[in-house]
Amino acid sequence: MTPEAAYQNLLEFQRETAYLASLGALAAWDQRTMIPKKGHEHRARQMAALARLLHQRMTDPRIGEWLEKVEGSPLVQDPLSDAAVNVREWRQAYERARAIPERLAVELAQAESEAESFWEEARPRDDWRGFLPYLKRVYALTKEKAEVLFALPPAPGDPPYGELYDALLDGYEPGMRARELLPLFAELKEGLKGLLDRILGSGKRPDTSILHRPYPVEAQRRFALELLSACGYDLEAGRLDPTAHPFEIAIGPGDVRITTRYYEDFFNAGIFGTLHEMGHALYEQGLPKEHWGTPRGDAVSLGVHESQSRTWENLVGRSLGFWERFFPRAREVFASLGDVSLEDFHFAVNAVEPSLIRVEADEVTYNLHILVRLELELALFRGELSPEDLPEAWAEKYRDHLGVAPKDYKDGVMQDVHWAGGLFGYFPTYTLGNLYAAQFFQKAEAELGPLEPRFARGEFQPFLDWTRARIHAEGSRFRPRVLVERVTGEAPSARPFLAYLEKKYAALYG
Protein backbone atom coordinates (compact mmCIF):
# COMPACT_ATOMS: atom_id res chain seq x y z
CA MET A 1 0.00 0.00 0.00
CA THR A 2 1.32 3.45 -0.93
CA PRO A 3 1.53 6.26 1.67
CA GLU A 4 -1.12 8.13 -0.36
CA ALA A 5 -3.54 5.19 -0.19
CA ALA A 6 -2.87 4.71 3.51
CA TYR A 7 -3.54 8.39 4.18
CA GLN A 8 -6.80 8.23 2.22
CA ASN A 9 -7.85 5.22 4.31
CA LEU A 10 -7.06 7.18 7.48
CA LEU A 11 -9.10 10.17 6.29
CA GLU A 12 -12.16 8.07 5.49
CA PHE A 13 -11.95 5.98 8.65
CA GLN A 14 -11.40 8.94 11.00
CA ARG A 15 -14.19 10.96 9.39
CA GLU A 16 -16.56 8.03 9.89
CA THR A 17 -15.51 7.95 13.55
CA ALA A 18 -16.15 11.69 13.77
CA TYR A 19 -19.70 11.21 12.43
CA LEU A 20 -20.38 8.68 15.20
CA ALA A 21 -18.86 10.98 17.82
CA SER A 22 -21.08 13.81 16.57
CA LEU A 23 -24.12 11.64 17.31
CA GLY A 24 -22.76 11.37 20.84
CA ALA A 25 -22.55 15.16 20.96
CA LEU A 26 -26.19 15.38 19.87
CA ALA A 27 -27.20 12.91 22.59
CA ALA A 28 -25.19 14.90 25.15
CA TRP A 29 -26.94 18.13 24.11
CA ASP A 30 -30.32 16.42 24.43
CA GLN A 31 -29.40 15.01 27.85
CA ARG A 32 -28.70 18.50 29.18
CA THR A 33 -31.65 20.27 27.56
CA MET A 34 -34.65 18.19 26.48
CA ILE A 35 -34.51 14.64 27.82
CA PRO A 36 -37.51 13.41 29.88
CA LYS A 37 -36.71 12.69 33.51
CA LYS A 38 -37.22 8.96 33.05
CA GLY A 39 -34.91 8.81 30.04
CA HIS A 40 -31.61 9.19 31.89
CA GLU A 41 -31.02 5.52 32.67
CA HIS A 42 -31.45 4.50 29.04
CA ARG A 43 -29.31 7.43 27.88
CA ALA A 44 -26.47 6.31 30.15
CA ARG A 45 -26.58 2.88 28.47
CA GLN A 46 -26.66 4.51 25.03
CA MET A 47 -23.60 6.60 25.87
CA ALA A 48 -21.78 3.56 27.21
CA ALA A 49 -22.55 1.60 24.03
CA LEU A 50 -21.34 4.48 21.88
CA ALA A 51 -18.20 4.84 24.01
CA ARG A 52 -17.49 1.15 23.46
CA LEU A 53 -17.94 1.49 19.71
CA LEU A 54 -15.79 4.63 19.52
CA HIS A 55 -13.08 3.05 21.62
CA GLN A 56 -13.03 0.02 19.32
CA ARG A 57 -12.66 2.29 16.30
CA MET A 58 -10.00 4.48 17.91
CA THR A 59 -7.94 1.39 18.79
CA ASP A 60 -8.44 -0.43 15.48
CA PRO A 61 -5.02 -1.91 14.59
CA ARG A 62 -5.46 -0.76 11.00
CA ILE A 63 -4.91 2.81 12.21
CA GLY A 64 -1.44 1.84 13.40
CA GLU A 65 -0.69 0.08 10.11
CA TRP A 66 -1.83 3.06 8.03
CA LEU A 67 0.10 5.51 10.22
CA GLU A 68 3.28 3.48 9.80
CA LYS A 69 2.87 3.67 6.01
CA VAL A 70 2.48 7.46 6.09
CA GLU A 71 4.98 8.41 8.79
CA GLY A 72 8.37 9.19 7.29
CA SER A 73 6.93 9.56 3.77
CA PRO A 74 7.12 12.74 1.65
CA LEU A 75 3.45 13.33 2.53
CA VAL A 76 4.44 14.48 6.02
CA GLN A 77 7.85 15.96 5.24
CA ASP A 78 6.57 19.47 6.00
CA PRO A 79 5.56 19.22 9.69
CA LEU A 80 2.98 21.99 9.25
CA SER A 81 1.24 20.49 6.22
CA ASP A 82 -2.37 19.37 6.62
CA ALA A 83 -1.36 15.71 6.35
CA ALA A 84 1.48 16.05 8.86
CA VAL A 85 -0.75 17.79 11.40
CA ASN A 86 -3.42 15.11 11.05
CA VAL A 87 -0.93 12.24 11.29
CA ARG A 88 0.76 13.79 14.35
CA GLU A 89 -2.53 14.13 16.22
CA TRP A 90 -3.93 10.79 15.05
CA ARG A 91 -0.80 9.03 16.30
CA GLN A 92 -1.10 10.55 19.76
CA ALA A 93 -4.85 9.86 19.94
CA TYR A 94 -4.27 6.28 18.81
CA GLU A 95 -1.60 5.62 21.42
CA ARG A 96 -3.69 7.21 24.19
CA ALA A 97 -6.83 5.29 23.21
CA ARG A 98 -4.97 2.00 22.78
CA ALA A 99 -3.43 2.35 26.24
CA ILE A 100 -6.85 2.67 27.91
CA PRO A 101 -8.57 -0.71 28.35
CA GLU A 102 -12.00 -0.92 26.75
CA ARG A 103 -13.45 -1.89 30.13
CA LEU A 104 -12.17 1.40 31.62
CA ALA A 105 -13.42 3.52 28.71
CA VAL A 106 -16.92 2.05 28.96
CA GLU A 107 -17.10 2.19 32.77
CA LEU A 108 -15.93 5.79 32.77
CA ALA A 109 -18.46 6.87 30.12
CA GLN A 110 -21.32 5.27 32.05
CA ALA A 111 -20.13 6.61 35.41
CA GLU A 112 -19.84 10.14 34.01
CA SER A 113 -23.30 10.01 32.43
CA GLU A 114 -24.88 8.73 35.65
CA ALA A 115 -23.01 11.27 37.80
CA GLU A 116 -24.01 14.19 35.57
CA SER A 117 -27.65 13.11 35.62
CA PHE A 118 -27.64 12.73 39.41
CA TRP A 119 -25.87 16.08 39.83
CA GLU A 120 -28.68 17.81 37.90
CA GLU A 121 -31.16 16.63 40.55
CA ALA A 122 -28.89 16.65 43.59
CA ARG A 123 -27.50 20.16 43.34
CA PRO A 124 -30.82 22.04 43.79
CA ARG A 125 -31.60 19.98 46.90
CA ASP A 126 -28.04 20.36 48.27
CA ASP A 127 -27.56 16.59 48.40
CA TRP A 128 -23.79 16.19 48.78
CA ARG A 129 -24.15 12.93 50.68
CA GLY A 130 -26.12 11.38 47.80
CA PHE A 131 -23.78 12.78 45.14
CA LEU A 132 -20.53 11.71 46.81
CA PRO A 133 -20.62 8.00 45.76
CA TYR A 134 -21.05 9.07 42.11
CA LEU A 135 -18.16 11.53 42.39
CA LYS A 136 -15.92 8.98 44.10
CA ARG A 137 -16.47 6.49 41.30
CA VAL A 138 -15.76 9.04 38.56
CA TYR A 139 -12.64 10.21 40.42
CA ALA A 140 -11.34 6.66 40.92
CA LEU A 141 -11.83 5.79 37.25
CA THR A 142 -10.30 9.10 36.11
CA LYS A 143 -7.28 8.48 38.32
CA GLU A 144 -6.91 5.03 36.80
CA LYS A 145 -7.05 6.62 33.35
CA ALA A 146 -4.45 9.22 34.37
CA GLU A 147 -2.08 6.50 35.57
CA VAL A 148 -2.36 4.75 32.20
CA LEU A 149 -1.72 7.97 30.26
CA PHE A 150 1.12 9.07 32.53
CA ALA A 151 3.07 5.96 31.50
CA LEU A 152 2.95 7.04 27.83
CA PRO A 153 5.54 9.33 26.26
CA PRO A 154 4.19 12.81 25.43
CA ALA A 155 3.73 13.88 21.83
CA PRO A 156 6.94 14.64 19.91
CA GLY A 157 8.22 18.08 20.88
CA ASP A 158 6.10 18.31 24.04
CA PRO A 159 7.76 18.47 27.48
CA PRO A 160 7.74 15.31 29.63
CA TYR A 161 5.07 14.77 32.25
CA GLY A 162 6.15 15.80 35.73
CA GLU A 163 3.20 14.44 37.71
CA LEU A 164 -0.03 12.50 37.29
CA TYR A 165 -2.12 15.64 36.80
CA ASP A 166 -0.11 16.56 33.70
CA ALA A 167 -1.50 13.54 31.84
CA LEU A 168 -5.03 14.90 32.34
CA LEU A 169 -4.15 18.53 31.66
CA ASP A 170 -2.47 17.48 28.42
CA GLY A 171 -5.81 16.20 27.13
CA TYR A 172 -7.32 19.68 27.33
CA GLU A 173 -4.30 21.95 26.79
CA PRO A 174 -1.75 19.99 24.73
CA GLY A 175 1.81 20.59 25.88
CA MET A 176 0.86 22.40 29.10
CA ARG A 177 2.28 21.13 32.40
CA ALA A 178 1.53 21.96 36.04
CA ARG A 179 5.08 23.29 36.50
CA GLU A 180 4.37 25.89 33.78
CA LEU A 181 0.87 26.68 35.05
CA LEU A 182 1.77 27.38 38.65
CA PRO A 183 4.11 30.36 38.00
CA LEU A 184 1.44 31.91 35.74
CA PHE A 185 -1.13 31.55 38.51
CA ALA A 186 1.30 32.90 41.11
CA GLU A 187 1.92 36.06 39.05
CA LEU A 188 -1.80 36.37 38.40
CA LYS A 189 -2.78 35.89 42.04
CA GLU A 190 -0.41 38.61 43.21
CA GLY A 191 -1.64 41.10 40.62
CA LEU A 192 -5.31 40.28 41.13
CA LYS A 193 -5.20 40.50 44.91
CA GLY A 194 -3.46 43.89 44.73
CA LEU A 195 -6.04 45.20 42.27
CA LEU A 196 -8.92 43.74 44.28
CA ASP A 197 -7.67 45.41 47.46
CA ARG A 198 -7.51 48.79 45.69
CA ILE A 199 -11.00 48.38 44.24
CA LEU A 200 -12.54 47.38 47.55
CA GLY A 201 -10.70 50.23 49.27
CA SER A 202 -11.81 52.85 46.74
CA GLY A 203 -15.14 53.43 48.44
CA LYS A 204 -16.90 53.46 45.05
CA ARG A 205 -19.71 50.98 44.47
CA PRO A 206 -22.01 50.64 41.47
CA ASP A 207 -25.73 50.22 42.00
CA THR A 208 -26.05 46.55 41.09
CA SER A 209 -29.69 46.47 42.18
CA ILE A 210 -30.57 47.64 38.66
CA LEU A 211 -29.47 44.21 37.42
CA HIS A 212 -31.90 42.48 39.80
CA ARG A 213 -35.09 44.11 38.62
CA PRO A 214 -37.72 42.20 36.62
CA TYR A 215 -36.31 40.93 33.31
CA PRO A 216 -38.90 38.66 31.67
CA VAL A 217 -37.32 35.49 30.34
CA GLU A 218 -38.92 35.78 26.91
CA ALA A 219 -37.61 39.34 26.55
CA GLN A 220 -34.14 38.15 27.54
CA ARG A 221 -34.31 35.40 24.93
CA ARG A 222 -35.33 37.83 22.17
CA PHE A 223 -32.61 40.31 23.14
CA ALA A 224 -30.00 37.53 23.31
CA LEU A 225 -30.93 36.43 19.78
CA GLU A 226 -30.50 40.01 18.54
CA LEU A 227 -27.01 40.18 20.08
CA LEU A 228 -26.05 36.83 18.57
CA SER A 229 -27.06 37.94 15.10
CA ALA A 230 -25.33 41.32 15.39
CA CYS A 231 -22.04 39.79 16.51
CA GLY A 232 -21.84 37.29 13.67
CA TYR A 233 -23.24 34.01 15.06
CA ASP A 234 -24.98 32.14 12.24
CA LEU A 235 -28.43 31.30 13.59
CA GLU A 236 -29.11 29.11 10.55
CA ALA A 237 -26.21 26.92 11.70
CA GLY A 238 -27.06 26.91 15.40
CA ARG A 239 -29.69 27.49 18.05
CA LEU A 240 -30.12 28.90 21.55
CA ASP A 241 -31.81 26.89 24.32
CA PRO A 242 -32.16 27.09 28.12
CA THR A 243 -30.28 24.71 30.43
CA ALA A 244 -29.17 24.32 34.05
CA HIS A 245 -25.46 24.75 33.27
CA PRO A 246 -24.71 26.71 30.07
CA PHE A 247 -22.56 25.15 27.37
CA GLU A 248 -21.78 25.21 23.65
CA ILE A 249 -21.60 22.03 21.62
CA ALA A 250 -20.61 21.44 18.01
CA ILE A 251 -22.62 18.71 16.31
CA GLY A 252 -21.14 19.42 12.89
CA PRO A 253 -20.05 22.22 10.56
CA GLY A 254 -23.61 23.46 10.07
CA ASP A 255 -24.86 22.76 13.59
CA VAL A 256 -23.14 24.56 16.49
CA ARG A 257 -25.53 24.96 19.43
CA ILE A 258 -25.44 27.17 22.51
CA THR A 259 -27.41 27.23 25.73
CA THR A 260 -27.88 29.74 28.51
CA ARG A 261 -29.55 30.06 31.90
CA TYR A 262 -32.14 32.78 32.55
CA TYR A 263 -33.30 34.33 35.82
CA GLU A 264 -36.33 36.61 35.84
CA ASP A 265 -34.65 38.89 38.36
CA PHE A 266 -31.03 38.91 37.15
CA PHE A 267 -29.82 40.41 33.88
CA ASN A 268 -26.23 39.14 33.74
CA ALA A 269 -26.66 35.36 33.78
CA GLY A 270 -28.75 35.06 30.63
CA ILE A 271 -27.19 37.82 28.53
CA PHE A 272 -23.50 37.48 29.38
CA GLY A 273 -23.86 33.71 29.52
CA THR A 274 -25.15 33.85 25.95
CA LEU A 275 -22.24 36.05 24.83
CA HIS A 276 -19.79 33.64 26.46
CA GLU A 277 -21.18 30.58 24.73
CA MET A 278 -21.46 32.56 21.50
CA GLY A 279 -17.70 33.12 21.63
CA HIS A 280 -17.17 29.36 21.74
CA ALA A 281 -19.62 28.91 18.88
CA LEU A 282 -18.00 31.58 16.71
CA TYR A 283 -14.75 29.62 16.99
CA GLU A 284 -16.45 26.38 15.96
CA GLN A 285 -18.31 28.10 13.10
CA GLY A 286 -14.99 29.59 11.96
CA LEU A 287 -13.01 26.35 11.79
CA PRO A 288 -12.14 25.23 8.24
CA LYS A 289 -15.16 23.20 7.13
CA GLU A 290 -13.20 21.33 4.48
CA HIS A 291 -11.14 19.78 7.27
CA TRP A 292 -14.08 18.75 9.48
CA GLY A 293 -13.54 15.39 11.15
CA THR A 294 -9.75 15.75 11.19
CA PRO A 295 -7.39 17.46 13.65
CA ARG A 296 -6.61 20.12 11.05
CA GLY A 297 -10.24 21.20 11.37
CA ASP A 298 -10.43 20.91 15.16
CA ALA A 299 -10.03 23.56 17.85
CA VAL A 300 -6.45 23.47 19.12
CA SER A 301 -7.20 23.46 22.85
CA LEU A 302 -9.72 24.39 25.49
CA GLY A 303 -7.59 27.36 26.53
CA VAL A 304 -7.72 28.84 23.04
CA HIS A 305 -11.43 27.95 22.89
CA GLU A 306 -11.96 29.79 26.17
CA SER A 307 -10.03 32.79 24.87
CA GLN A 308 -12.75 33.23 22.27
CA SER A 309 -15.63 32.96 24.74
CA ARG A 310 -14.04 35.31 27.29
CA THR A 311 -13.20 37.79 24.53
CA TRP A 312 -16.82 38.11 23.47
CA GLU A 313 -18.24 37.98 27.00
CA ASN A 314 -15.84 40.48 28.56
CA LEU A 315 -13.43 42.33 26.28
CA VAL A 316 -16.23 42.96 23.79
CA GLY A 317 -19.46 42.39 25.73
CA ARG A 318 -18.59 44.34 28.88
CA SER A 319 -16.93 47.21 27.02
CA LEU A 320 -18.45 50.68 27.03
CA GLY A 321 -18.45 50.70 23.23
CA PHE A 322 -20.58 47.56 23.10
CA TRP A 323 -23.24 49.07 25.32
CA GLU A 324 -23.13 52.43 23.55
CA ARG A 325 -24.46 50.36 20.66
CA PHE A 326 -26.93 48.10 22.46
CA PHE A 327 -28.09 49.91 25.61
CA PRO A 328 -30.71 52.01 23.77
CA ARG A 329 -32.20 48.77 22.44
CA ALA A 330 -31.98 47.15 25.89
CA ARG A 331 -34.05 50.03 27.31
CA GLU A 332 -36.69 49.39 24.65
CA VAL A 333 -36.81 45.66 25.44
CA PHE A 334 -36.66 45.91 29.24
CA ALA A 335 -38.94 48.41 30.97
CA SER A 336 -36.85 47.95 34.13
CA LEU A 337 -34.01 49.93 32.53
CA GLY A 338 -36.14 52.97 31.76
CA ASP A 339 -34.60 55.15 34.48
CA VAL A 340 -31.03 53.82 34.18
CA SER A 341 -28.21 55.72 32.46
CA LEU A 342 -25.64 54.08 30.18
CA GLU A 343 -22.84 54.97 32.60
CA ASP A 344 -24.61 53.46 35.61
CA PHE A 345 -25.48 50.32 33.64
CA HIS A 346 -21.91 49.88 32.37
CA PHE A 347 -20.53 50.31 35.89
CA ALA A 348 -23.06 47.79 37.24
CA VAL A 349 -22.22 45.05 34.73
CA ASN A 350 -18.55 45.53 35.60
CA ALA A 351 -19.03 45.47 39.36
CA VAL A 352 -16.27 43.78 41.34
CA GLU A 353 -17.19 41.85 44.48
CA PRO A 354 -15.84 38.57 45.87
CA SER A 355 -18.56 35.95 45.49
CA LEU A 356 -19.27 32.22 45.73
CA ILE A 357 -20.35 31.32 42.18
CA ARG A 358 -17.67 30.96 39.50
CA VAL A 359 -19.92 31.44 36.47
CA GLU A 360 -21.26 34.71 37.86
CA ALA A 361 -17.89 36.07 39.02
CA ASP A 362 -16.45 39.34 37.73
CA GLU A 363 -13.29 39.66 35.65
CA VAL A 364 -11.08 40.54 38.61
CA THR A 365 -12.07 37.67 40.91
CA TYR A 366 -12.92 34.97 38.34
CA ASN A 367 -9.43 33.50 38.12
CA LEU A 368 -9.25 33.20 41.91
CA HIS A 369 -12.21 30.80 41.61
CA ILE A 370 -10.15 28.80 39.12
CA LEU A 371 -7.13 28.84 41.43
CA VAL A 372 -9.26 27.18 44.14
CA ARG A 373 -10.21 24.39 41.75
CA LEU A 374 -6.67 23.96 40.42
CA GLU A 375 -5.23 23.61 43.91
CA LEU A 376 -7.92 21.08 44.88
CA GLU A 377 -7.41 19.02 41.72
CA LEU A 378 -3.65 18.97 42.24
CA ALA A 379 -4.19 17.82 45.83
CA LEU A 380 -6.57 15.06 44.68
CA PHE A 381 -4.16 13.67 42.11
CA ARG A 382 -1.13 14.05 44.36
CA GLY A 383 -2.88 11.91 46.96
CA GLU A 384 -3.08 14.78 49.45
CA LEU A 385 -6.89 14.97 49.47
CA SER A 386 -9.79 12.56 49.07
CA PRO A 387 -13.23 13.38 47.58
CA GLU A 388 -14.82 13.12 51.05
CA ASP A 389 -12.69 16.05 52.21
CA LEU A 390 -13.56 18.37 49.34
CA PRO A 391 -16.30 20.49 51.02
CA GLU A 392 -14.09 21.50 53.94
CA ALA A 393 -11.05 22.11 51.72
CA TRP A 394 -13.22 24.11 49.31
CA ALA A 395 -14.50 26.39 52.06
CA GLU A 396 -11.00 26.91 53.44
CA LYS A 397 -9.58 27.93 50.06
CA TYR A 398 -12.49 30.27 49.35
CA ARG A 399 -11.86 32.02 52.65
CA ASP A 400 -8.16 32.28 51.81
CA HIS A 401 -8.41 33.44 48.18
CA LEU A 402 -11.71 35.34 48.11
CA GLY A 403 -12.59 36.08 51.72
CA VAL A 404 -15.96 34.32 51.46
CA ALA A 405 -17.16 30.79 52.27
CA PRO A 406 -20.27 28.83 51.18
CA LYS A 407 -23.05 28.06 53.63
CA ASP A 408 -24.24 25.05 51.64
CA TYR A 409 -22.97 22.54 49.08
CA LYS A 410 -24.89 23.73 46.01
CA ASP A 411 -23.10 27.09 46.02
CA GLY A 412 -19.87 25.42 47.10
CA VAL A 413 -18.33 22.17 45.97
CA MET A 414 -21.41 21.11 43.95
CA GLN A 415 -21.78 24.26 41.85
CA ASP A 416 -19.97 22.90 38.75
CA VAL A 417 -20.84 19.85 36.66
CA HIS A 418 -17.22 19.33 35.56
CA TRP A 419 -16.08 16.82 38.17
CA ALA A 420 -19.26 14.76 37.70
CA GLY A 421 -18.29 14.58 34.02
CA GLY A 422 -14.73 13.50 34.82
CA LEU A 423 -13.27 16.79 33.57
CA PHE A 424 -10.35 16.95 35.98
CA GLY A 425 -7.63 19.14 34.46
CA TYR A 426 -10.20 21.24 32.58
CA PHE A 427 -10.56 24.22 34.95
CA PRO A 428 -7.09 25.76 34.37
CA THR A 429 -7.98 26.24 30.71
CA TYR A 430 -10.51 28.91 31.74
CA THR A 431 -7.72 31.06 33.14
CA LEU A 432 -5.43 30.31 30.22
CA GLY A 433 -8.28 31.50 28.03
CA ASN A 434 -8.40 34.83 29.86
CA LEU A 435 -4.66 35.28 29.43
CA TYR A 436 -4.69 34.33 25.74
CA ALA A 437 -7.74 36.57 25.14
CA ALA A 438 -5.98 39.67 26.46
CA GLN A 439 -2.89 38.93 24.37
CA PHE A 440 -4.91 38.34 21.20
CA PHE A 441 -7.05 41.45 21.76
CA GLN A 442 -3.98 43.62 22.38
CA LYS A 443 -2.50 42.42 19.09
CA ALA A 444 -5.79 42.94 17.22
CA GLU A 445 -5.90 46.57 18.36
CA ALA A 446 -2.27 47.02 17.33
CA GLU A 447 -3.20 45.88 13.81
CA LEU A 448 -6.77 47.19 13.45
CA GLY A 449 -6.66 50.26 15.67
CA PRO A 450 -8.96 50.92 18.67
CA LEU A 451 -11.86 48.48 18.60
CA GLU A 452 -14.37 50.03 21.01
CA PRO A 453 -15.32 52.85 18.61
CA ARG A 454 -16.07 50.15 16.02
CA PHE A 455 -18.20 48.22 18.51
CA ALA A 456 -20.11 51.43 19.29
CA ARG A 457 -20.97 51.65 15.59
CA GLY A 458 -22.04 48.00 15.49
CA GLU A 459 -18.98 46.99 13.47
CA PHE A 460 -17.99 43.57 14.78
CA GLN A 461 -17.06 41.88 11.51
CA PRO A 462 -13.51 43.30 11.18
CA PHE A 463 -12.53 41.90 14.57
CA LEU A 464 -14.29 38.59 13.90
CA ASP A 465 -12.51 38.35 10.55
CA TRP A 466 -9.18 39.00 12.29
CA THR A 467 -9.74 36.13 14.73
CA ARG A 468 -10.96 33.88 11.93
CA ALA A 469 -7.82 34.45 9.85
CA ARG A 470 -5.26 34.20 12.65
CA ILE A 471 -6.81 31.73 15.10
CA HIS A 472 -9.82 29.82 13.78
CA ALA A 473 -8.40 29.00 10.34
CA GLU A 474 -5.35 27.31 11.85
CA GLY A 475 -7.34 24.51 13.50
CA SER A 476 -4.88 22.31 15.42
CA ARG A 477 -1.90 23.10 13.21
CA PHE A 478 0.08 24.63 16.11
CA ARG A 479 0.34 23.82 19.81
CA PRO A 480 -1.45 26.49 21.92
CA ARG A 481 1.79 28.07 23.14
CA VAL A 482 3.12 28.25 19.57
CA LEU A 483 -0.15 29.70 18.26
CA VAL A 484 -0.09 32.45 20.90
CA GLU A 485 3.54 33.24 20.04
CA ARG A 486 2.84 33.32 16.29
CA VAL A 487 -0.21 35.58 16.65
CA THR A 488 1.14 37.96 19.31
CA GLY A 489 4.92 37.65 19.13
CA GLU A 490 5.09 36.72 22.82
CA ALA A 491 4.85 33.59 24.94
CA PRO A 492 1.71 33.18 27.08
CA SER A 493 1.88 35.65 29.95
CA ALA A 494 -0.30 37.15 32.68
CA ARG A 495 0.99 40.67 32.00
CA PRO A 496 -1.35 41.77 29.16
CA PHE A 497 -4.38 40.53 31.10
CA LEU A 498 -3.34 42.34 34.27
CA ALA A 499 -2.61 45.51 32.28
CA TYR A 500 -6.07 45.32 30.68
CA LEU A 501 -7.73 44.96 34.08
CA GLU A 502 -5.67 47.77 35.65
CA LYS A 503 -6.61 50.21 32.89
CA LYS A 504 -10.29 49.29 32.80
CA TYR A 505 -10.95 49.21 36.52
CA ALA A 506 -8.86 52.29 37.31
CA ALA A 507 -11.27 54.18 35.04
CA LEU A 508 -14.31 52.65 36.74
CA TYR A 509 -13.20 52.72 40.38
CA GLY A 510 -10.62 55.55 40.08
UniProtKB/Swiss-Prot annotation:
Q: What is its EC number?
A: 3.4.17.19
Q: Give the residue interval(s) assigned to the motif HPF.
A: 245-247
Q: What name is this protein filed under? A: Thermostable carboxypeptidase 1
Per the entry, what this protein does is: Broad specificity carboxypetidase that releases amino acids sequentially from the C-terminus, including neutral, aromatic, polar and basic residues, but not Pro. Has lower activity with substrates ending with Gly or Glu.
Residues binding Zn(2+), per UniProt: H276, H280, E306
What family, per the record?
Belongs to the peptidase M32 family.
Q: Where is this motif: DXRXT?
A: 255-259
The free-text note explaining how the cofactor binds reads:
Binds 1 zinc ion per subunit.
The record describes its quaternary structure and partners as:
Homodimer.
Q: Which reaction does it catalyse?
A: Release of a C-terminal amino acid with broad specificity, except for -Pro
Motif I/NRXXA/SD extends across 357-362
Q: Where is this motif: GXXQDXHW?
A: 412-419
